[in-house]
Protein backbone atom coordinates (compact mmCIF):
# COMPACT_ATOMS: atom_id res chain seq x y z
CA UNK A 1 0.00 0.00 0.00
CA UNK A 2 1.00 3.61 -0.47
CA UNK A 3 3.39 4.93 2.16
CA UNK A 4 3.04 8.36 3.74
CA UNK A 5 4.73 11.31 2.05
CA UNK A 6 4.45 15.06 1.89
CA UNK A 7 1.29 15.98 0.02
CA UNK A 8 1.31 19.02 -2.24
CA UNK A 9 -1.15 18.66 -5.13
CA UNK A 10 -1.59 21.25 -7.86
CA UNK A 11 -3.95 24.17 -7.25
CA UNK A 12 -7.52 22.85 -7.39
CA UNK A 13 -10.83 24.34 -8.39
CA UNK A 14 -11.84 25.96 -11.65
CA UNK A 15 -10.87 29.60 -11.12
CA UNK A 16 -8.23 31.62 -12.98
CA UNK A 17 -5.43 30.41 -10.69
CA UNK A 18 -6.21 26.68 -10.88
CA UNK A 19 -3.98 24.12 -12.54
CA UNK A 20 -6.77 23.19 -14.92
CA UNK A 21 -6.36 26.58 -16.64
CA UNK A 22 -2.59 26.85 -16.29
CA UNK A 23 -1.13 23.57 -17.53
CA UNK A 24 -0.71 24.19 -21.26
CA UNK A 25 3.08 23.97 -20.89
CA UNK A 26 2.71 20.38 -19.68
CA UNK A 27 0.20 19.58 -22.44
CA UNK A 28 2.65 20.81 -25.07
CA UNK A 29 5.21 18.36 -23.70
CA UNK A 30 2.71 15.49 -23.90
CA UNK A 31 1.76 16.42 -27.46
CA UNK A 32 5.42 16.59 -28.45
CA UNK A 33 5.98 12.85 -27.85
CA UNK A 34 2.52 11.56 -28.76
CA UNK A 35 3.45 10.26 -32.20
CA UNK A 36 6.51 8.40 -30.91
CA UNK A 37 4.42 6.73 -28.19
CA UNK A 38 1.79 5.80 -30.74
CA UNK A 39 4.38 4.21 -33.00
CA UNK A 40 5.98 2.24 -30.18
CA UNK A 41 2.72 0.80 -28.82
CA UNK A 42 1.50 -0.18 -32.28
CA UNK A 43 4.74 -2.03 -32.97
CA UNK A 44 5.40 -3.61 -29.57
CA UNK A 45 2.25 -4.08 -27.47
CA UNK A 46 1.34 -7.77 -27.62
CA UNK A 47 -2.25 -8.27 -26.47
CA UNK A 48 -2.24 -12.00 -27.20
CA UNK A 49 0.81 -12.66 -25.06
CA UNK A 50 -0.72 -10.64 -22.24
CA UNK A 51 -3.89 -12.73 -22.34
CA UNK A 52 -5.69 -14.07 -25.46
CA UNK A 53 -9.00 -13.89 -23.56
CA UNK A 54 -8.43 -10.35 -22.31
CA UNK A 55 -11.74 -8.47 -22.14
CA UNK A 56 -10.87 -5.50 -19.90
CA UNK A 57 -7.80 -3.42 -20.64
CA UNK A 58 -6.65 -1.40 -17.64
CA UNK A 59 -4.77 1.89 -17.72
CA UNK A 60 -3.52 3.96 -14.78
CA UNK A 61 -2.41 7.59 -14.85
CA UNK A 62 -0.21 8.25 -11.83
CA UNK A 63 -0.18 11.85 -10.60
CA UNK A 64 -3.22 12.76 -12.70
CA UNK A 65 -3.90 16.13 -11.01
CA UNK A 66 -7.25 17.71 -11.96
CA UNK A 67 -7.15 17.66 -15.75
CA UNK A 68 -7.37 18.31 -18.58
CA UNK A 69 -4.00 16.77 -19.44
CA UNK A 70 -4.75 13.43 -17.80
CA UNK A 71 -7.82 12.92 -20.01
CA UNK A 72 -5.79 13.88 -23.06
CA UNK A 73 -3.00 11.41 -22.22
CA UNK A 74 -5.41 8.58 -21.40
CA UNK A 75 -7.42 9.09 -24.58
CA UNK A 76 -4.23 8.98 -26.63
CA UNK A 77 -3.37 5.59 -25.10
CA UNK A 78 -6.88 4.21 -25.60
CA UNK A 79 -6.96 5.27 -29.24
CA UNK A 80 -3.65 3.51 -29.88
CA UNK A 81 -4.67 0.33 -28.03
CA UNK A 82 -7.99 0.20 -29.92
CA UNK A 83 -6.12 0.45 -33.20
CA UNK A 84 -3.71 -2.29 -32.13
CA UNK A 85 -6.61 -4.44 -30.93
CA UNK A 86 -8.44 -4.03 -34.24
CA UNK A 87 -5.34 -5.13 -36.13
CA UNK A 88 -4.78 -8.19 -33.93
CA UNK A 89 -8.46 -9.21 -33.97
CA UNK A 90 -8.41 -9.20 -37.77
CA UNK A 91 -5.38 -11.48 -37.71
CA UNK A 92 -6.46 -13.82 -34.92
CA UNK A 93 -10.04 -14.79 -34.03
CA UNK A 94 -9.03 -15.55 -30.43
CA UNK A 95 -8.80 -11.83 -29.63
CA UNK A 96 -11.84 -10.87 -27.52
CA UNK A 97 -13.70 -7.52 -27.64
CA UNK A 98 -12.18 -4.95 -25.30
CA UNK A 99 -13.54 -2.67 -22.61
CA UNK A 100 -11.35 -0.10 -20.87
CA UNK A 101 -10.92 0.63 -17.17
CA UNK A 102 -8.94 3.75 -16.21
CA UNK A 103 -7.54 4.51 -12.75
CA UNK A 104 -6.83 8.17 -12.03
CA UNK A 105 -4.32 8.38 -9.19
CA UNK A 106 -3.11 11.35 -7.19
CA UNK A 107 -2.57 12.48 -3.62
CA UNK A 108 -5.54 12.21 -1.23
CA UNK A 109 -6.03 16.00 -1.11
CA UNK A 110 -6.02 16.33 -4.88
CA UNK A 111 -9.23 17.95 -6.14
CA UNK A 112 -10.87 14.78 -7.46
CA UNK A 113 -14.26 16.54 -7.54
CA UNK A 114 -13.01 18.99 -10.17
CA UNK A 115 -11.26 16.15 -12.00
CA UNK A 116 -14.41 14.14 -12.55
CA UNK A 117 -16.67 17.17 -12.95
CA UNK A 118 -14.58 18.32 -15.92
CA UNK A 119 -14.16 14.88 -17.47
CA UNK A 120 -15.13 15.07 -21.17
CA UNK A 121 -18.63 13.59 -21.63
CA UNK A 122 -17.44 11.57 -24.63
CA UNK A 123 -14.87 9.75 -22.48
CA UNK A 124 -17.62 8.19 -20.36
CA UNK A 125 -18.58 6.13 -23.40
CA UNK A 126 -14.96 5.11 -23.95
CA UNK A 127 -13.95 3.82 -20.51
CA UNK A 128 -14.93 3.27 -16.88
CA UNK A 129 -13.26 5.71 -14.47
CA UNK A 130 -12.01 5.23 -10.91
CA UNK A 131 -10.26 7.74 -8.65
CA UNK A 132 -7.40 6.29 -6.62
CA UNK A 133 -6.14 8.54 -3.78
CA UNK A 134 -2.65 7.85 -2.51
CA UNK A 135 1.00 8.69 -3.05
CA UNK A 136 2.52 6.88 -6.02
CA UNK A 137 5.62 6.42 -3.87
CA UNK A 138 4.15 3.09 -2.87
CA UNK A 139 1.56 0.69 -4.26
CA UNK A 140 -1.88 2.12 -4.88
CA UNK A 141 -3.36 -0.73 -6.97
CA UNK A 142 -3.52 -4.55 -6.75
CA UNK A 143 -0.71 -6.72 -8.06
CA UNK A 144 -0.77 -7.62 -11.76
CA UNK A 145 -3.76 -5.39 -12.44
CA UNK A 146 -2.48 -2.79 -14.94
CA UNK A 147 -1.65 -3.18 -18.63
CA UNK A 148 -0.33 0.33 -19.27
CA UNK A 149 0.79 2.82 -16.65
CA UNK A 150 1.42 6.45 -17.47
CA UNK A 151 2.84 9.44 -15.65
CA UNK A 152 3.55 12.90 -17.03
CA UNK A 153 5.65 15.63 -15.40
CA UNK A 154 5.35 14.16 -11.91
CA UNK A 155 8.46 12.35 -10.71
CA UNK A 156 10.50 15.53 -10.18
CA UNK A 157 8.22 15.97 -7.14
CA UNK A 158 9.93 14.11 -4.32
CA UNK A 159 8.21 12.26 -1.50
CA UNK A 160 9.79 14.76 0.90
CA UNK A 161 12.43 17.47 1.21
CA UNK A 162 15.77 15.91 2.23
CA UNK A 163 16.15 16.49 5.97
CA UNK A 164 19.74 17.75 5.66
CA UNK A 165 18.80 20.84 3.65
CA UNK A 166 16.75 22.19 6.57
CA UNK A 167 19.33 21.30 9.22
CA UNK A 168 21.36 24.34 10.33
CA UNK A 169 24.15 22.03 11.49
CA UNK A 170 24.46 20.25 8.14
CA UNK A 171 26.80 21.13 5.29
CA UNK A 172 23.73 20.64 3.10
CA UNK A 173 21.77 23.42 4.81
CA UNK A 174 20.16 25.37 1.96
CA UNK A 175 19.83 28.61 3.92
CA UNK A 176 19.78 31.16 1.10
CA UNK A 177 17.70 29.26 -1.46
CA UNK A 178 14.28 27.62 -1.69
CA UNK A 179 15.15 24.85 -4.15
CA UNK A 180 18.03 22.76 -5.47
CA UNK A 181 19.67 25.14 -7.92
CA UNK A 182 22.95 23.15 -7.98
CA UNK A 183 24.98 25.99 -6.44
CA UNK A 184 25.84 24.04 -3.27
CA UNK A 185 27.35 20.61 -3.86
CA UNK A 186 26.10 19.11 -0.59
CA UNK A 187 22.54 20.30 -1.28
CA UNK A 188 22.62 18.79 -4.76
CA UNK A 189 23.87 15.48 -3.36
CA UNK A 190 21.10 15.38 -0.73
CA UNK A 191 18.42 15.99 -3.35
CA UNK A 192 19.99 13.50 -5.75
CA UNK A 193 20.01 10.76 -3.10
CA UNK A 194 16.34 11.45 -2.28
CA UNK A 195 15.43 11.37 -5.99
CA UNK A 196 17.19 8.03 -6.50
CA UNK A 197 15.46 6.56 -3.46
CA UNK A 198 12.05 7.82 -4.58
CA UNK A 199 12.48 6.63 -8.16
CA UNK A 200 13.41 3.20 -6.84
CA UNK A 201 10.25 3.09 -4.71
CA UNK A 202 8.13 4.36 -7.62
CA UNK A 203 9.39 1.71 -10.04
CA UNK A 204 9.16 -1.10 -7.48
CA UNK A 205 5.49 -0.26 -6.87
CA UNK A 206 4.71 -0.03 -10.59
CA UNK A 207 6.47 -3.34 -11.26
CA UNK A 208 4.14 -5.00 -8.76
CA UNK A 209 1.02 -3.39 -10.23
CA UNK A 210 1.76 -4.05 -13.91
CA UNK A 211 1.09 -7.39 -15.56
CA UNK A 212 4.08 -9.16 -17.16
CA UNK A 213 4.58 -7.52 -20.54
CA UNK A 214 2.78 -4.39 -19.37
CA UNK A 215 4.17 -0.98 -20.24
CA UNK A 216 5.09 1.98 -18.04
CA UNK A 217 5.27 5.28 -19.93
CA UNK A 218 7.10 8.07 -18.12
CA UNK A 219 7.38 11.65 -19.32
CA UNK A 220 9.17 14.40 -17.45
CA UNK A 221 11.87 17.04 -17.41
CA UNK A 222 15.58 16.66 -16.78
CA UNK A 223 18.83 18.53 -17.25
CA UNK A 224 21.49 17.73 -19.82
CA UNK A 225 24.64 16.43 -18.15
CA UNK A 226 26.74 19.37 -17.03
CA UNK A 227 23.87 21.88 -16.92
CA UNK A 228 22.96 23.39 -13.55
CA UNK A 229 19.42 24.32 -12.56
CA UNK A 230 20.32 27.96 -11.90
CA UNK A 231 21.32 28.28 -15.58
CA UNK A 232 17.80 27.44 -16.83
CA UNK A 233 14.76 29.71 -17.00
CA UNK A 234 12.92 27.44 -14.57
CA UNK A 235 15.77 27.76 -12.08
CA UNK A 236 15.75 31.54 -12.46
CA UNK A 237 12.01 31.54 -11.75
CA UNK A 238 12.43 29.66 -8.47
CA UNK A 239 15.37 31.82 -7.41
CA UNK A 240 13.26 34.91 -8.15
CA UNK A 241 10.40 33.56 -6.03
CA UNK A 242 12.95 33.07 -3.24
CA UNK A 243 14.07 36.69 -3.64
CA UNK A 244 10.44 37.82 -3.36
CA UNK A 245 10.06 35.90 -0.10
CA UNK A 246 13.16 37.66 1.24
CA UNK A 247 11.64 41.02 0.29
CA UNK A 248 8.44 40.07 2.11
CA UNK A 249 10.44 39.17 5.22
CA UNK A 250 11.99 42.64 5.13
CA UNK A 251 8.48 44.09 5.02
CA UNK A 252 7.37 41.91 7.94
CA UNK A 253 4.92 39.82 5.90
CA UNK A 254 6.83 36.65 6.82
CA UNK A 255 10.04 35.88 8.73
CA UNK A 256 13.62 34.95 7.87
CA UNK A 257 13.27 31.86 10.05
CA UNK A 258 10.34 30.56 7.99
CA UNK A 259 12.20 31.16 4.74
CA UNK A 260 15.31 29.38 6.03
CA UNK A 261 13.21 26.28 6.73
CA UNK A 262 11.41 26.31 3.38
CA UNK A 263 12.57 24.17 0.46
CA UNK A 264 10.66 22.84 -2.50
CA UNK A 265 10.46 19.01 -2.67
CA UNK A 266 11.53 19.15 -6.31
CA UNK A 267 14.58 17.76 -8.14
CA UNK A 268 15.35 17.72 -11.84
CA UNK A 269 17.97 15.00 -12.46
CA UNK A 270 20.67 15.15 -15.07
CA UNK A 271 20.25 12.62 -17.89
CA UNK A 272 22.90 10.23 -16.55
CA UNK A 273 21.36 10.35 -13.05
CA UNK A 274 17.93 9.56 -14.45
CA UNK A 275 19.16 6.61 -16.49
CA UNK A 276 21.16 5.26 -13.56
CA UNK A 277 18.15 5.41 -11.24
CA UNK A 278 15.94 3.56 -13.73
CA UNK A 279 18.51 0.87 -14.48
CA UNK A 280 18.60 -0.04 -10.77
CA UNK A 281 15.20 -1.73 -11.10
CA UNK A 282 15.71 -5.21 -12.55
CA UNK A 283 12.00 -5.91 -13.10
CA UNK A 284 11.80 -3.63 -16.15
CA UNK A 285 13.55 -3.47 -19.47
CA UNK A 286 14.11 -0.04 -21.00
CA UNK A 287 12.32 -0.33 -24.33
CA UNK A 288 12.70 3.29 -25.33
CA UNK A 289 14.44 6.29 -23.81
CA UNK A 290 14.61 9.52 -25.73
CA UNK A 291 15.69 12.97 -24.62
CA UNK A 292 14.04 15.73 -26.62
CA UNK A 293 13.52 19.47 -26.46
CA UNK A 294 10.28 20.76 -25.00
CA UNK A 295 8.20 22.36 -27.79
CA UNK A 296 8.02 25.63 -25.81
CA UNK A 297 11.61 25.65 -24.55
CA UNK A 298 12.77 28.04 -27.29
CA UNK A 299 9.75 30.32 -26.97
CA UNK A 300 9.89 33.63 -25.09
CA UNK A 301 7.12 32.89 -22.60
CA UNK A 302 5.15 35.90 -21.40
CA UNK A 303 5.51 37.12 -17.81
CA UNK A 304 1.80 36.50 -17.24
CA UNK A 305 2.11 32.93 -18.53
CA UNK A 306 5.04 32.21 -16.20
CA UNK A 307 3.36 33.79 -13.17
CA UNK A 308 0.07 31.95 -13.69
CA UNK A 309 1.75 28.60 -14.31
CA UNK A 310 3.98 28.75 -11.24
CA UNK A 311 1.19 29.99 -9.02
CA UNK A 312 -0.89 26.96 -10.04
CA UNK A 313 2.05 24.63 -9.41
CA UNK A 314 3.44 26.06 -6.16
CA UNK A 315 0.60 27.77 -4.31
CA UNK A 316 -0.31 24.68 -2.26
CA UNK A 317 3.21 24.04 -0.97
CA UNK A 318 3.75 27.76 -0.27
CA UNK A 319 0.40 28.11 1.50
CA UNK A 320 1.09 25.04 3.65
CA UNK A 321 4.35 26.54 4.95
CA UNK A 322 3.69 30.29 5.05
CA UNK A 323 -0.11 30.49 5.29
CA UNK A 324 -2.70 31.38 2.68
CA UNK A 325 -2.41 35.14 3.19
CA UNK A 326 1.08 35.14 1.67
CA UNK A 327 0.22 33.71 -1.77
CA UNK A 328 -1.46 36.74 -3.38
CA UNK A 329 1.26 39.16 -2.29
CA UNK A 330 4.07 36.78 -3.23
CA UNK A 331 2.91 36.38 -6.82
CA UNK A 332 2.14 40.08 -7.11
CA UNK A 333 5.76 40.75 -6.13
CA UNK A 334 6.93 38.00 -8.47
CA UNK A 335 5.05 39.47 -11.44
CA UNK A 336 6.55 42.87 -10.62
CA UNK A 337 10.11 41.48 -10.55
CA UNK A 338 9.58 39.70 -13.88
CA UNK A 339 8.34 42.96 -15.38
CA UNK A 340 11.39 44.83 -14.09
CA UNK A 341 13.88 42.07 -14.96
CA UNK A 342 12.47 39.88 -17.77
CA UNK A 343 14.06 36.47 -18.27
CA UNK A 344 16.30 36.37 -21.34
CA UNK A 345 15.35 32.95 -22.69
CA UNK A 346 18.02 33.04 -25.38
CA UNK A 347 20.75 33.18 -22.73
CA UNK A 348 19.25 30.41 -20.59
CA UNK A 349 20.45 26.83 -20.91
CA UNK A 350 17.75 24.39 -21.88
CA UNK A 351 15.98 21.80 -19.81
CA UNK A 352 15.06 18.67 -21.71
CA UNK A 353 12.08 16.32 -21.80
CA UNK A 354 12.62 12.60 -21.23
CA UNK A 355 10.23 10.08 -22.73
CA UNK A 356 10.73 6.56 -21.43
CA UNK A 357 8.86 3.32 -22.10
CA UNK A 358 9.57 0.45 -19.72
CA UNK A 359 8.31 -3.12 -20.13
CA UNK A 360 7.52 -5.29 -17.14
CA UNK A 361 9.52 -8.53 -17.30
UniProtKB/Swiss-Prot annotation:
GO terms classed as biological process: methylation
UniProt GO molecular function: metal ion binding; methyltransferase activity
Query: How and how many cofactors are bound, per the record note?
Result: Binds 1 Mg(2+) ion per subunit.
Give its E.C. classification number: 2.1.1.-
Name the SUPFAM superfamilies on file.
Answer: S-adenosyl-L-methionine-dependent methyltransferases
Q: What cofactor does this chain's UniProt record say it requires?
A: Mg(2+)
Annotated keywords: Magnesium, Metal-binding, Methyltransferase, S-adenosyl-L-methionine, Transferase
The record's Pfam families line, in alphabetical order, gives:
Methyltransf_7
The entry marks the following residues as binding S-adenosyl-L-homocysteine, namely: 19, 64, 69, 106-107, 135-136
Is Transferase tagged as a keyword?
A: yes
Q: Which residues bind Mg(2+)?
A: 174, 260, 262-263
Question: Whom does it interact with, and what assembly results?
Answer: Homodimer.
Family assignment?
Belongs to the methyltransferase superfamily. Type-7 methyltransferase family.
This chain belongs to the protein called: Probable S-adenosylmethionine-dependent methyltransferase At5g38780
Q: Can you name the source organism?
A: Arabidopsis thaliana
Amino acid sequence: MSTSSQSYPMSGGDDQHSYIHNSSYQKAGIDGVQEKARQYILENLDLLNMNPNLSTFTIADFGCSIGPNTFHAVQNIIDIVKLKHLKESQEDSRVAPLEFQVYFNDLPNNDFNTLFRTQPPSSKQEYFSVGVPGSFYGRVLPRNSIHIGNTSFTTHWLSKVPEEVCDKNSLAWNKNYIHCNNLIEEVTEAYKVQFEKDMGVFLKARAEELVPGGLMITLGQCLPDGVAMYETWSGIVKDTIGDCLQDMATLGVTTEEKIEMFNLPVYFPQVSELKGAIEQNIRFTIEMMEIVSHPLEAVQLSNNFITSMYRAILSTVIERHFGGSVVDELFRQFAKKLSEHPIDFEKCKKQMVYHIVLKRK
